[in-house]
A protein has these predicted regions:
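Membrane-entry segments of alpha-helical transmembrane domains in multi-pass membrane proteins
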Residues: 1-12, 28-35, 39, 76-94, ...
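Transmembrane helix-loop-helix hairpins at membrane boundaries of multipass inner-membrane proteins
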Residues: 1-6, 24-122, 195-224, 229, ...
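Alpha-helical transmembrane segments and their helix-start/interface "positive-inside/aromatic belt" motifs
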Residues: 30-43, 172-184, 383-392, 483-499, ...
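Hydrophobic alpha-helical membrane-insertion segments
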Residues: 39-56, 181-196, 392-400, 492-514, ...
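Membrane-interfacial helical/loop segments at transmembrane boundaries in membrane proteins
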Residues: 61-76, 201-220, 410-421, 510-544
Length: 674
C-alpha cells in the first residue's frame, strides 16, 4: 500500500461510516449504526498509530503531495492534498484515538435516547473526518473547508436536542461567534493569497516569506503596518474563535447543552485545539512578528486566569470542566506567544487525554445520578461508583500538574516558557499562569469533593424532574442509590486514564528537546530564545520532578487542593458566607464579566435596531413609500389636476384653443420684432 492510499483510507473511512449511519440508519438499526462508525474510526486509529510509529522508528518521511486539483481559476489552483509529518501524525493519533473512545462510550451514554441515536453516531464520525481533513491539509483552502466543516458539525451536535430552546440558542450562539473569528481568518487567507506569491500551498507561502519580510500594508490613510503582523493577527482572530480565546470564548460554556460525549470529543480534545494547531503550523510566519506573538501571549494569559475564576462558582459538573478547558486553552496560547510551539502541541496532546477523561467521567457521574448535572445534588459517589471516582481523580491530578502525571510535564513547561520569554507582556503572562495554578487546583478539587465526598445530598432533596438530558430523565429519588456505569462507559475511562498518567513522562524529551518536530516547527532562536534556554535547563523527566520541589508551582497547586478540601469537606457552610461577603465579585463572576450581556444588548440588539431602522426608514419610508409608491402618487396627483381641464363643454375647449393660438402668435411676433 503506497502512502497516498494509506492517508486516503485514514481520512475517508470515518466519512463512509458517517454516510452509512446517516443515510441507512433506519435500515441497519442502532447496533448497525454504532458498529459501522466504530469500525471506521478504529481503522483510522490503528492506521494513524502505524503512521506515527513509522515516524518514530525512522522508516517514514514527510509526505506533501496533492491528491487532485479541485478547481483552476485565473492561474490559481485549488487542490486537495495531504501534508503528513510528525505533528500531523501526532494529531491524527489524538483525534482518532479520542474519537474511538468517545464512540464506544456513546453506546452506553445514549442508550436511553429514543430518537436520534443513529444521527448522533453519524455526526461524530463526520466530525472525525472533518478534523482529519483539517490537520492533514497542505494548503489554506483545504484548511478552511475543514475549519468550517468541524464548525458545522459542532453546530449540529450542540443543538442535538433541538426541541430544547436552550440548545438551539447555544448552537446558534456558537455558530455566530465562530463566524466572527472565521471572518478574520478568511481575511488573513486573502492577504496570504494576495501578497505571498499567489499560492495557497504552505510550502510555497513559507518559501516566499523573505520577499515580504519588510513589506507594509496601509490600514487607513497615513497608517501602515507590517504586512506579516497584520496577516498573523487576522489568522489568529480565526484561532480565537475556534479555540475559544477571550473575548470570543463565550460560546464554549454554552456548548455543554450538547450530549456529554461530544463535549469530550469536540469541545475539549480536538476541535478547540484546531486554532492552536494552525498557529503552530504557521510558525515560520509568526516567527517574523514579535508584535503578533506578544498579542497572542497576552490574550492567552487573560483567558487562562480569568476563565479559571469563572470555574470556581459553577455548580453544573460539565460547566466546571468547560471552564477548565477554556483556561487550559489559554495556557496553550501563552506557549504559542512565547514561541514554544512544541510545548503548546505537547500540552494539546496531554490535555486531549486527561480532559476527555474528565468529561467522560463527568458523564458517567451524570448517568449514575439519573442525568442530574447539579453537583449540589451529589456527594459520596465514591462509595457507589469506584471506577468513575478513580478515573476522575486521575484526570484532576493530571489537570492540576501533579508530578509524574502527564499534565505536570506539559503545564510546567508552559509556565517555564512564559518565565523565559523576553517579549512584551511576558511578565503578565507568567504571573497569570502562576496564579491560574492555584485557581485550577481549587475548582478541580472543589468539583471532586462535591461529587465524590461528603453527604449524599440527593437524599435531602424534594422529588424533582431534571430535563437537562432529553425529555424523559429524572434525578435520583431519596431512597435511590447510584450504580457504577456499564463496562461500555467505564472501559474508555480506564483506557484514557493510562495516557493521562504516562504519556507526559514518555513524550517530553523527544517532543520538546529532541528531533520530533525537526523541520516541522520553525523558531527564530536569536529573536525568541525561550526554547533554547529551556533546553539548557532540562536534565530529564525525573530531574524535572525534583526541580518542582523548589518551584512555587507545586505549592500553589497543593494550596488550591487544601483550600477546596477545607471549604467543601471540613467547613461546607463557609463558601456561602464567603460569597455573601464578596457579593460584588461573586455577581461579576456569576454574570461572566457581563460579556454575554454586552454582546446581547449592544451587538445583537444594536444590529437588530440598525436593521429595523433600515427597514422602516430605508426600505419602507424611502423606497416603498417614497420612490415606488411616491412616484405612483405623484403621477396620480398630476393626472387628477389634468382631469379638471376635461370639462366636457365645447366652449371650454374653444376658449383653450383661442388661448393657445394667441400664445403662439405672441411668441412669433416676439421673435420677429425683438
Amino acid at each position: 500500500m503506497n502512502d497516498m492510499t494509506l492517508y486516503l483510507i485514514i481520512a475517508l473511512v470515518p466519512l463512509a461510516g458517517s454516510l452509512i449511519a446517516g443515510l441507512f440508519g433506519n435500515k441497519i438499526g442502532r447496533a448497525g449504526a454504532h458498529t459501522v462508525t466504530i469500525l471506521g474510526v478504529a481503522v483510522s486509529a490503528v492506521l494513524s498509530a502505524y503512521v506515527l510509529w513509522g515516524f518514530l522508528n525512522g522508516s517514514r518521511t514527510k509526505f506533501d503531495e496533492n491528491v487532485y486539483t479541485w478547481l483552476t481559476m485565473g492561474g490559481l489552483d485549488f487542490s486537495v492534498g495531504f501534508l503528513v509529518d510528525t505533528m500531523t501524525a501526532m494529531m491524527m493519533v489524538v483525534v482518532t484515538g479520542v474519537s474511538l473512545m468517545v464512540h464506544i462510550y456513546t453506546i452506553g451514554y445514549m442508550h436511553d435516547e429514543k430518537v436520534g441515536y443513529q444521527r448522533f453516531f453519524s455526526y461524530i464520525s463526520l466530525f472525525t473526518f472533518s478534523m482529519l481533513m483539517l490537520i492533514m491539509s497542505n494548503n489554506f483552502i483545504q484548511l478552511f473547508f475543514g475549519w468550517e466543516a468541524v464548525g458545522l458539525v459542532s453546530y449540529l451536535l450542540i443543538g442535538f436536542y433541538f426541541k430544547r430552546p436552550s440548545a438551539t440558542f447555544a448552537n446558534l450562539k456558537a455558530f455566530l461567534i465562530n463566524r466572527v473569528g472565521d471572518f478574520g481568518f478568511l481575511l488573513g487567507i486573502g492577504l496570504v493569497l494576495a501578497y505571498f506569491g499567489g499560492s495557497l500551498r504552505y510550502q510555497d507561502v513559507f518559501a516566499y516569506l523573505p520577499n515580504v519580510q519588510t513589506a507594509t500594508i496601509q490600514l487607513f490613510p497615513g497608517v501602515e503596518w507590517s504586512l506579516i503582523t497584520v496577516t498573523c493577527l487576522l489568522l489568529f482572530v480565526g484561532a480565537m474563535g475556534k479555540s475559544a480565546q477571550f473575548p470570543l470564548h463565550v460560546w464554549l460554556p454554552d456548548s455543554m447543552e450538547g450530549p456529554t460525549p461530544i463535549s469530550a470529543l469536540i469541545h475539549a480534545a480536538t476541535m478547540v485545539t484546531a486554532g492552536l494547531f494552525m498557529v503552530s503550523r504557521m510558525s515560520p510566519i509568526y516567527e517574523m512578528s514579535s508584535t503578533a506573538l506578544s498579542v497572542i501571549m497576552v490574550i492567552g494569559a487573560i483567558t487562562a486566569l480569568f476563565m479559571g475564576f469563572l470555574g470556581v462558582i459553577q455548580n453544573d459538573i460539565k460547566r466546571v470542566v468547560a471552564y477548565s478547558t477554556l483556561s487550559q486553552l489559554g495556557y496553550m496560547t501563552v506557549a504559542l506567544g512565547a514561541s514554544a510551539y512544541s510545548v503548546a502541541m505537547f500540552h494539546v496532546m496531554t490535555h486531549a487525554f486527561f480532559k476527555a477523561l474528565l468529561f467522560l467521567a463527568a458523564g458517567s457521574a451524570i448517568i449514575g445520578m439519573h442525568h442530574d448535572q447539579d453537583m449540589r445534588h451529589m456527594g459520596n459517589l465514591k462509595k457507589y461508583m469506584p471506577i468513575t471516582w478513580l478515573t476522575m481523580l486521575i484526570g484532576n491530578l493530571s489537570l492540576i500538574g501533579t508530578p509524574f502525571f502527564s499534565g505536570f510535564y506539559s503545564k510546567d513547561s508552559i509556565i517555564e516558557a512564559a518565565k523565559y520569554s523576553t517579549l512584551p507582556g511576558s511578565g503578565f503572562a507568567y504571573f497569570a499562569v502562576l496564579a491560574s495554578v492555584f485557581v485550577t487546583a481549587f475548582y478541580a478539587f472543589r468539583q471532586y469533593f462535591m461529587v465524590f465526598h461528603g453527604e449524599e445530598k440527593w437524599r435531602s432533596l424534594p422529588e424533582h424532574h431534571d430535563d437537562h438530558h432529553g425529555e424523559e430523565h429524572h434525578g435520583l429519588g431519596k431512597n435511590d442509590n447510584p450504580h457504577e456505569s456499564p463496562l461500555v462507559v467505564t472501559l474508555p475511562l480506564i483506557l484514557l486514564a493510562i495516557p493521562s498518567i504516562i504519556i507526559g513522562y514518555v513524550a517530553i524529551e523527544p517532543m520538546l528537546y529532541g528531533d520530533f518536530f525537526k523541520d516541522v516547527i520553525f523558531v527564530n532562536a536569536d529573536a525568541h530564545p525561550t526554547m533554547h534556554i529551556m533546553k539548557e535547563e532540562f536534565h530529564g523527566a525525573l530531574a524535572m520532578v525534583s526541580h518542582s520541589l523548589h518551584s512555587p508551582v507545586l505549592y500553589l497547586a497543593i494550596a488550591g487542593v487544601l483550600s477546596a478540601w477545607l471549604l467543601y469537606v471540613k467547613l461546607p457552610h463557609l463558601p456561602a458566607k464567603i460569597a455573601q461577603a464578596f457579593r460584588p465579585v461573586y455577581v461579576l463572576f456569576e454574570n461572566k464579566y457581563y460579556l454575554d450581556a454586552l454582546y446581547f444588548n449592544v451587538f445583537a440588539k444594536g444590529t437588530r435596531a440598525l436593521g429595523t431602522f433600515f427597514w422602516k426608514v430605508g426600505d419602507t419610508a424611502i423606497i416603498d413609500n417614497g420612490i415606488v409608491n411616491g412616484s405612483a402618487k405623484l403621477v396620480g396627483a398630476i393626472a387628477a389636476q389634468v382631469r379638471k381641464v376635461q370639462t366636457g363643454f365645447i366652449y371650454t375647449y374653444a376658449a383653450a384653443m383661442v388661448f393657445g393660438v394667441l400664445v403662439l402668435l405672441g411668441m412669433t411676433f416676439w421673435g420677429l420684432f425683438r
